[in-house]
Amino acid sequence: MEQLSAANTRFALDLFRALNESNPAGNIFISPFSISSALAMILLGTRGNTEAQMSKALHFDTVKDIHSRFQSLNADINKCGASYILKLANRLFGEKTYHFLPEFLASTQKTYGAELASVDFLRASEEARKAINEWVKEQTEGKIPELLASGVVDSATKLVLVNAIYFKGSWQEKFMTEATKDAPFRLNKKDSKTVKMMYQKKKFPFGYIKELKCRVLELPYQGKDLSMVILLPDSIEDESTGLRKIEQHLTLEKLNEWTKPDNLELLEVNVHLPRFRLEESYDLNAPLARLGVQDLFGSRADLTGMSEARDLFISKVVHKAFVEVNEEGTEAAAATAGIAVFAMLMPEEDFIADHPFIFFIRHNPSSNILFLGRLSSP
């Protein structure tokens, strides 16, 4: 499992960097895990150069038995009885007159639980689009009502692969609503806006990265299988969001080092965190091409593992993600024992998230990053 989670994290950070290049100061929110899952389904049907480019970009070339590992990971993440709701759903929507190889359909069904729904793109592409959106809306509890905008599919569309992920978790330690106050949030050195700032003082895993002058806070969700981890610089030092330096150093190795339990200490922390809600949409063709996935989106695509016809390529990889963080906990969706100590001399730390920060929601047992974002403006 470790190999796969390392590959998924490397890809998550590469994609974050690619999105950052085209949007250096705005909000970013994605579910890298959802995107990796959807691309892994496509990978099942790729051959030749197309397969090599995708494997390399997703860092799957370092992982043995990639698909069976995904299968166990999906089962682990979707496990019932967990104290949070986390739903991962995959589906293929195929043109009903087009012949897909039975082996491909059997593999996606077995490994990713993805059924093929036959739709009529050829004669009724608008109805097909609505059916796909309706399915995603249902899987994400209404949070993503329109994954595919009008015109994204047409009569030439053969296949749409959809991955939807939905998460709702309550904080292990909730914020009291009455402690929430209006407070300024600094967007950069010059500008600020008023936000609803939540507050609580409890013991949390806390760390400090000296060379980056950055605080690390882990806020566990009930059950502790999932946590939100926040990287907050002490101040805004650059001319943008203040996150440049951290973003330049974001690698799998660094991230593991900064956030591993041995490097975090359970301390009393005064946590000030804004309530926020992000809804972001991405066309991932350009960022993926930047990461080396080039043949998939055009006539050079080799998808002969999906169909014998040579005319199949992936026209678009669309991703939408939603997150809401409040006093109770977090709701997010995307498509693609403390020991009591005398409290006399407990050192206290302040964690005042009143300027931009990077955050991610991690599945702790597998170390997979399910959601990753930058909050520049709540």
From Swiss-Prot:
UniProt xrefs under CDD domains: serpinB1_LEI
Gene3D superfamilies for the chain: Alpha-1-antitrypsin, domain 1 (2.30.39.10), Antithrombin, subunit I, domain 2 (3.30.497.10)
GO cellular component, one term: extracellular space
Start and end residues of each stretch annotated as CARD-binding motif (CBM): 350-378
Residues annotated with Phosphoserine modification: S299
A Gene Ontology molecular function term of the record: serine-type endopeptidase inhibitor activity
Keywords, alphabetical: Acetylation, Cytoplasm, Disulfide bond, Endosome, Lysosome, Phosphoprotein, Protease inhibitor, Secreted, Serine protease inhibitor
N6-acetyllysine found at: K137
SMART domains: SERPIN
Example GO BP: negative regulation of interleukin-1 beta production
Sites marked Reactive bond: A343, M344
Pfam families per record: Serpin
Family annotation (InterPro entries): Serpin_CS, Serpin_dom, Serpin_fam, Serpin_sf, Serpin_sf_1, Serpin_sf_2
Entry keyword Disulfide bond: yes
Transmembrane segments: none
Residue numbers carrying N-acetylmethionine: M1
Subcellular location: Secreted; Cytoplasm; Cytolytic granule; Early endosome
UniProt record similarity statement: Belongs to the serpin family. Ov-serpin subfamily.
Assembly mode: Monomer. Interacts (via C-terminus) with CASP1; CASP4 (via CARD domain) and CASP5; these interactions regulate the activity of inflammatory caspases. Interacts with PRTN3. Interacts with GZMH.
Matches recorded under PANTHER family: LEUKOCYTE ELASTASE INHIBITOR, SERINE PROTEASE INHIBITOR, SERPIN
Protein name, UniProt field: Leukocyte elastase inhibitor
Species: Sus scrofa
